[in-house]
């Protein structure tokens, strides 16, 4: 057994939270001249590690509430401009999550922005990132209900468990003042701490209709855009193609 294999066994034991086994198993097997048995043990450990990772991915995918079928493989990226394709490829690395960067996807209905962001999320889940996909209007109603029950802080903490929160179709429905308030609270809570992905048919100049006042609109845009990647889906609608 090679030194690299020894290190791999120790690394896997650390991953399994079995540090004592990691420290002792190689020494004891070698002392008993059980090299082939160590190789078998490594193979079993690798199988266990692979199975654990897949189970975690499956759990993350179930928790994400992503729309079915919107995967990276099913996304026809060739219909997008070269710049957008490059942006999506970079976002798929997941580095933006480490940097708590936000992503904004603008485009008319049918241009593929929701599919693209859901597909991006699916790729992130494969990298064992936690993601939640939710229509903005539904999340706003859930937060309003929590606020009425004096439970808004707990609801926000629950959302904080997700590294990436996808707000789909921001501005699809006009917000009332109380709805705009909880939406702004959510954005402010995640600012520079967790990433938000926003899809919207509305450009920034129309966001005052969402947040109800120039001051709240400017503050919301500032927090979302401060660390962000802006993607523009300037392509024909696939629904009319």
Language-model features, listed with the residues they occupy:
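Walker A/P-loop nucleotide-binding motif
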Residues: 100-116
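Interdomain "pre-motor" coupling segment immediately N-terminal to P-loop NTPase/helicase cores
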Residues: 10, 14-67
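Intrinsically disordered, low-complexity and often Lys/Arg-enriched segments
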Residues: 1-11, 241
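Conserved post-Walker A coupling segment in P-loop NTPases
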Residues: 100-104, 120-123, 127-143
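Phosphate-binding P-loop
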Residues: 92-100
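N-terminal pre-Walker A segment at the start of P-loop NTPase domains
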Residues: 70-92
């Amino acid at each position: 057994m090679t030194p690299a294999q020894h290190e791999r066994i120790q690394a896997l034991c650390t991953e399994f939270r079995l540090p004592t086994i990691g420290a002792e198993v190689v020494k004891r097997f070698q002392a008993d001249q059980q090299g082939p048995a160590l190789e078998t043990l490594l193979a079993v450990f690798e199988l266990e590690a692979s199975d654990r990772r897949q189970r975690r991915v499956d759990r993350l995918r179930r928790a994400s509430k992503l729309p079915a079928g919107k995967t990276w493989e099913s996304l026809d990226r060739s219909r997008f401009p070269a710049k957008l394709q490059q942006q999506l490829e970079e976002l798929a690395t997941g580095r933006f999550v480490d940097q708590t960067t936000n992503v904004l996807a603008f485009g008319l209905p049918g241009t593929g922005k929701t599919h693209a962001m859901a597909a991006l999320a699916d790729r992130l889940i494969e990298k064992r990132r936690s993601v939640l996909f939710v229509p903005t209007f539904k999340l706003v109603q859930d937060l309003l209900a929590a606020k009425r029950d004096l439970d808004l802080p707990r609801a926000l903490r629950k959302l904080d468990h997700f590294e990436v929160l996808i707000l789909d179709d921001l501005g699809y429905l006009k917000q009332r003042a109380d709805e705009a308030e909880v939406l702004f609270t959510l954005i402010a809570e995640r600012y520079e701490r967790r990433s938000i992905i926003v899809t919207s048919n509305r450009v920034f100049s129309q966001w005052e209709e969402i947040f109800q006042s120039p001051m709240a609109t400017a503050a919301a845009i500032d927090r979302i855009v401060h660390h962000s990647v802006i993607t523009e889906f300037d392509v024909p609608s696939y629904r009319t193609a």
